[in-house]
């Protein structure tokens, strides 16, 4: 190890001695992260710009040793080259295959990690060439080249001369090319490696693409121009008045700089002219009671910076200014003095078509969805984003945790981490420093993150010290630092995937720092069960201030199937030889195409900031709590509804909500107990808070919060049971089973004792060959698979049901069919009892008796399943909806009357087939055809059910080889109805072992499910 370190240090020394020169070895030299690259500055537009985006000539080789040389020469023959869009990723344009791995590098399994060296084999190299014209008007100006994002590195030539080199795939590489260009036609050439020594710091959990992900452009600026500007707002101790420190760096020809601060209406707030000395100058404005910036109130001022050479203004630059403070005091993160809640999500820059190439329109769409979903914070996991993202977060109000492009997860932690490698100290520091220098002026950036899953050691300690010295106005966080030196090098306790007990233990044990999980609630597939529990704790403990859900959007890549449907591809879909972690990159709150997953509604509900508490609903009295920290509720109106058995019987509106931030106020809704329908089985009250006027990105009438309250709860037991019927019923028992029939109906039981046919008025309610059977299994969710429940609970998938009793008779005018089964694999017995009256209505009891001495794994569910003909294609129900919901994910699913298509029950945006479509809290559930004829199910307790055009086996990916996609499933010509006394929850703590909370599991034991089947005939 020491010998290797000395060799690396020697290489570093040689790099310093040869600064500015190209050796051709830079891509495996950690001491050389750039050649001739300009220092990073804050983001601003200045001068005349010429985009080089578009189609470039392109050449690709599979192995690095095969790369062409001399490509920068003007007369190089590129006639045989192909083409590549810029921006554009190679793998999405026909060059190489997309690779996804979570932990480990894309060469995993084929090359042993040996930093700084990377493989030659499969290290693709892309070479680019194009011409561009320099306008004559640019003569005498400084001309700069900016390459927004190049993975993993880039060499640059202009007109046959070497310009420079850059690493760090997620920050722009900028070069001064003034001396390299000429008026008229010029040639630029780039060469990029898929992997370089910097790749060891870019082991993020995402698609491993190569190419140019952001724009390439030229800028021409006067010789007298602004080099950089730093803006530091400071609020006084009362968070009322402010100062604004402005520091500028200029070129030597600048004689004066005019500073003008304008408010949102364009009015002048303050102005000053300064004369830089040695290219530097500064001034401090005093601003009385400025409008403050926060995610709730994104008030922006504009600073105009007019640069003059003594003869006139040569350049004017603008910067948005947000007056806000960030500090940590008494174990709380404070914004403008308030302990804000971080209702966050982690977000990769990812597009289902463009990969790393994300348009401004897509960014705005993402922020709009965040606003709709009540998300107020985003972590730029795990690298600095496109500068436009921060501009938009400033404008629309999103708190940002800005994360450096440092992740070396594949190297492991402990002594192997690159955080302890001297050779990589420069790269750690450079990536953090350049991020801070670029994004320092954005009010939306409230926290710096030094990286992600890159171990802990001296390299991060140095980064922490530099950031705190340069920018004491913001806290610094880093997850791995939580566990090192008592968290000395992180200002926030920012763990990943702490469970409820661990969060509560920290929060109630006199904490010294705020707890904000940088990743929590892993949203993979059908997930986010238990999100409400996290937020019960957040709202209980002042130092627990929220976290960032992993993650915002599935990373699937779009593929259009022959029938027009879209499948979203994940790791392993492109070849069978690259390393892959399969679908583990699809953990989004939303789908790749930005469709909401059902659990998105749970996020929206738990993240809302207006809460209602019933005080006395018999008099319509409620209390409204404003959880916001900076805005009142005057922009919203409350709409309320009084419902009887799911139907609105009275409604009203309160349009003048006057509740200050963090305050409560009582209101009286326009109903009393006299309005409660005496015959109604259930009385509900719905409240919703809606925008009175259109806001940026949100339409008038958008619902920002809602809740439901039960005034009179539905009693499922009341009236449950067979109604008396004078109509005759007959039972016939023979060796092939039993038949029970009345005057207009008949049912048939197979020789195994299962209900196998149900005919009413000549209409078959059950599909041919189907049976009403017990069901203990579900198609595993991603969380189930991660916990290996499909293996651990496999005994319940298709347990043998050994018939030991089958009796059928008429008792007191009711047909009674009794069956008893032994389940030897699970050491239990199961009794099914059917009582059928003369109207063909059926009361069924499913009773399992467990062996208390046996050790048997949990069940997925305890219920029944039957198959109906496909013409029964609608569900009408009274229960929770309208989206799917489960025992631990139902806070956003309100009770109501719903009518839906069977074809819409399965959420077809899950990238892999899995359990979907269940609706809980059911009072009754009806599956009907277009004429309204079908079957109603009700029980003596609230139950859950689904009706899908797919069998459970169709959705069970454990039945099939890997790489299953919903888009390739074909709906069956049948409707599969599942209904349960209990079904396991979903969980969300993580997707690789954590189970749902204990109260939401279905443990082995005794169960009794009493339900009724009632024909619905119209």
Predicted features along the sequence, with ranges:
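Accessory carbohydrate-binding/adhesion or oligomerization-edge regions at the termini
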Residues: 21-108, 187, 191-195, 535, ...
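Catalytic cores of secreted or luminal carbohydrate-active enzymes
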Residues: 205-226, 564-623, 627-649, 657, ...
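Intrinsically disordered, low-complexity Pro/Gly/Ser/Thr-rich segments with frequent PxxP/GP/PP motifs
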Residues: 273-289, 646-679
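Beta-strand/loop-rich accessory regions of lumenal/periplasmic or secreted enzymes
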Residues: 92, 101, 149, 194, ...
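Accessory beta-strand-rich segments of carbohydrate-active enzymes
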Residues: 26, 38-42, 59-61, 89-92, ...
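Extended acidic/polar, glycine-enriched regions
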Residues: 181-185, 249-327, 677, 686-726
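An acidic-aromatic loop/edge-strand motif
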Residues: 97, 105-118, 167-169, 177-242, ...
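Extended substrate-binding grooves/exosites of carbohydrate-active enzymes
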Residues: 22-43, 111, 200, 312-623, ...
